[in-house]
């Protein structure tokens, strides 16, 4: 373990120092043995910068005995509330309760989650009834493995003014990847009481090579800097210094930019000599150093650096030589930048270009899918050219040049694009109904999908609570009585597909179309699905089956029973769907899908059918034809339902 070696190195450094520093360490050690708690806050969720970046855990400390620490850096915690970070997303309140309740009675636990997706944010708050239990948990459970990850525990600090005080905060960089939070804590604990300790990691959990240690006093921080700065930790020389806030660092960078003396030159002729290089830039002022970068064969690589004695000379060289030709090549001459500066500028430039591109095509770029393989760019452009001027039309293809079944059409104005969406969505092209909509960025689509999932989960939960209380499920719009399928489960057309509102103006059941069933024959099996009514007969005359403890639906009028249809259509094509009014297509598809879903998953057939009905009509038609695809979608829906059940404690299907 790296922590043992690091601890030994730190201890050796302390032993070799003078008595003054030893006293500082002793006073810090005394504090560690006391029961005085420290205060800490949750980490900032911003991305950390590699060079003295914004601290991931800005914190405050508690006042201690004046004899040991002259200047306290914060105030004691006012409640027995602990922050628990670095948690696996699957960690729940129950898991944390089992761990922390072993220390003492827990008042409450809250895992913080995203407001939309309800996914864990990776941290939680644990509240004890008394401070002693909080102190004990902090001492005994810090860095305990929870689902394979070491947790990080600190006192919770809600006051932002205290949270952003950097007193006693130390920044360490050039760390070996093997050094983790615990190893860093063990190394620096020799210099004083540590309030928080964190090694920065990327999205995959790999160490970024830098971290932060927050001491409870400036003296402890100074001792750590004096002893460890420049030391070899795991054979790597580390830098240790006081943490500098991002705002301060940025102001220093701006000052350096305004008074730069170091100049970077590229696009130099590869035959240039050092004397020619010196003569070229020496005419603008005194040069303190210059470097013409060469390869292993001692041949110039085409770039170099010149450092002037003052800023005016450097600025003059940039003004005079930038974009000027020298030996047949146009030079680039500018202020020398560090790597992270260049990367930041490139990132900002890329984001700006991306934003401009998005704004340019906002509202004029269309996404078209469900295209036949034979439809090419020219055919796509011809079909959509009637609605305005097209700047581009592209079918997306794979590596072999085969169509992926979707493409994009870009117009010059939003009005043209909206007209095309209105006219072409669901229109038949080469035997398939098109899906046409405004193109959206992946992030927007993902956020919309997450919002839909959240709304759906909340609606299901409301239905479950209402059912448990004996309250009938809410129906949007003035619908007639529920029509039930085999086994007493509602047919989606009658409940509008999992609570989806009916189209305004259509208050009754959907109109009949040739060959379209509206309910299964009373008392008998569904046509083509023998034995599906094993749970009991469907009520005759289209009356809704009343479940125990439920009350009748409060619809404005009783809908007439729709006569049963003798058989299911063998094949329902896109042309058949096109003949159905648009507002009723979902209901038609729902009645066709429900028996197929019922065979695969009887208990959840109504919910799953409602979930499937949120798909585009073209994809629903494919599910009717392709049993394997339908099986896959049903399994996905069951997985979503199961995930929701797992995430909601006490919730049962």
UniProtKB/Swiss-Prot annotation:
Its main location: cytoplasm. It is found in: Cytoplasm; Nucleus. The keyword RNA-binding applies. The keyword Phosphoprotein applies. Residues 17-27 have a biased composition (Polar residues). One of its GO terms (molecular function) is mRNA 3'-UTR binding. GO terms for cellular component: cytoplasm; cytoplasmic stress granule; cytosol; nucleus; post-mRNA release spliceosomal complex; ribonucleoprotein complex. InterPro entries: Nucleotide-bd_a/b_plait_sf, PABP-dom, PABP_1234, PABP_HYD_C, PABP_RRM1, RBD_domain_sf, RRM2_I_PABPs, RRM_dom. Residues 1-10 have a biased composition (Basic and acidic residues). Residues 569-646 form the PABC domain. Residues 53-68 have a biased composition (Low complexity). GO terms for biological process: mRNA 3'-end processing; mRNA transport; nuclear-transcribed mRNA poly(A) tail shortening; regulation of nuclear-transcribed mRNA poly(A) tail shortening; regulation of translation. Residues 1-77 are annotated as: Disordered. Keywords: Cytoplasm, mRNA processing, mRNA transport, Nucleus, Phosphoprotein, Repeat, RNA-binding, Translation regulation, Transport. Residues 80-158, 168-245, 261-338, 364-441 form the RRM domain. Gene3D superfamilies: 3.30.70.330, c-terminal domain of poly(a) binding protein. The modification Phosphothreonine is found at residue 167. NCBIfam families: PABP-1234. Belongs to the polyadenylate-binding protein type-1 family. Interacts with cid13. Binds the poly(A) tail of mRNA. Appears to be an important mediator of the multiple roles of the poly(A) tail in mRNA biogenesis, stability and translation. In the nucleus, involved in both mRNA cleavage and polyadenylation. Is also required for efficient mRNA export to the cytoplasm. Acts in concert with a poly(A)-specific nuclease (PAN) to affect poly(A) tail shortening, which may occur concomitantly with either nucleocytoplasmic mRNA transport or translational initiation. This is Polyadenylate-binding protein, cytoplasmic and nuclear. It comes from Schizosaccharomyces pombe (strain 972 / ATCC 24843) (Fission yeast).
């Amino acid at each position: 373990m790296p922590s043992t070696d690091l601890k030994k190195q730190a201890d050796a450094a302390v032993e070799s120092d003078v008595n003054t520093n030893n006293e500082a360490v002793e006073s810090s050690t005394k504090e560690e043995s006391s029961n005085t708690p420290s205060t800490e806050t949750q980490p900032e969720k911003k991305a950390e910068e590699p060079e003295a970046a914004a601290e991931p855990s800005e914190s405050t400390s508690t006042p201690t005995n004046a004899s040991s620490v002259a200047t306290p850096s914060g105030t004691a915690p006012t409640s027995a509330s602990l922050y628990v970070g670095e948690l696996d997303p699957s960690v729940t309140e129950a898991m944390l309760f089992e761990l922390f309740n072993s220390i003492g009675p827990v008042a409450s636990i809250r895992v913080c989650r995203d407001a939309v997706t309800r996914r864990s944010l990776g941290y939680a708050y644990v509240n004890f009834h008394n401070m002693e239990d909080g102190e004990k948990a902090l001492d005994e459970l810090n860095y305990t493995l929870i689902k394979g990850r070491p947790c990080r525990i600190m006192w919770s600090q809600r006051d932002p003014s205290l949270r952003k005080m950097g007193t006693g905060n130390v920044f360490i960089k050039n760390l070996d990847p093997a050094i983790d939070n615990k190893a860093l804590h063990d190394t620096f604990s020799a210099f004083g009481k540590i309030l928080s300790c964190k090694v920065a990691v990327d999205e995959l959990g790999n160490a970024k090579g830098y971290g932060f240690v927050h001491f409870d006093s400036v003296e402890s921080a100074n001792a750590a800097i004096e002893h460890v700065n420049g030391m070899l930790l795991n054979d790597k020389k580390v830098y240790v210094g006081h943490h500098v806030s991002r705002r301060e660092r940025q102001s220093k960078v701006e000052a350096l930019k305004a008074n730069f003396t170091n100049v970077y030159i590229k696009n130099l002729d590869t035959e240039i000599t050092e004397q020619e290089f010196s003569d070229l830039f020496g005419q603008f002022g005194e040069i303190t150093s210059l470097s013409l970068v060469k390869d292993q064969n001692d041949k110039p690589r085409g770039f170099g650096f010149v450092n002037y004695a003052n800023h005016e000379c450097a600025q003059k060289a940039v003004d005079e030589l930038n974009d000027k030709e020298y030996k047949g090549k146009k030079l680039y001459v500018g202020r020398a930048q560090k790597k992270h500066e260049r990367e930041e500028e490139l990132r900002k430039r890329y984001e700006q270009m991306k934003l401009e591109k998005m704004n340019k095509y906002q509202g004029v770029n269309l996404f078209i899918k469900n295209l036949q393989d034979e439809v090419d760019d020219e055919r796509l452009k011809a079909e959509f050219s009637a609605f305005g001027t097209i700047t581009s039309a592209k079918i997306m293809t794979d590596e072999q040049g085969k169509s992926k079944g979707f493409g994009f059409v870009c117009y010059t104005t939003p009005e043209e694009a909206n007209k095309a969406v209105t006219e072409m969505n669901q229109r038949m092209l080469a035997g398939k109904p098109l899906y046409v909509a405004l193109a959206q960025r992946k992030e927007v689509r993902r956020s919309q999908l997450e919002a839909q999932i959240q709304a759906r989960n909340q609606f299901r939960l409301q239905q479950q609570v209402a059912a448990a209380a004996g309250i009938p499920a809410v129906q949007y719009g003035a619908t007639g009585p529920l029509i039930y399928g085999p086994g007493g489960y509602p047919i989606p057309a009658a409940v509008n597909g999992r609570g989806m509102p009916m189209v305004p103006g259509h208050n009754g059941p959907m109109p009949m179309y040739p060959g379209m069933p509206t309910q299964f024959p009373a008392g008998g099996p569904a046509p083509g699905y023998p034995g599906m009514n094993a749970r009991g007969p469907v009520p005759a005359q289209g009356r809704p089956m009343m479940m125990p403890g439920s009350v009748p639906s409060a619809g404005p009028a009783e809908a007439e029973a729709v006569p049963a249809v003798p058989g299911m259509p063998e094949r329902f094509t896109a042309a058949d769907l096109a003949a159905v009014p648009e507002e009723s297509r979902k209901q038609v598809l729902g009645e066709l899908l429900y028996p197929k879903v019922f065979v695969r998953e009887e208990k959840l057939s109504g919910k799953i059918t409602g979930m499937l009905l949120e798909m585009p009509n073209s994809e629903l038609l494919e599910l009717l034809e392709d049993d394997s695809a339908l099986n896959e979608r049903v399994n996905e829906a069951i997985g979503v339902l199961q995930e929701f059940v797992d995430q909601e404690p006490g919730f049962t299907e």
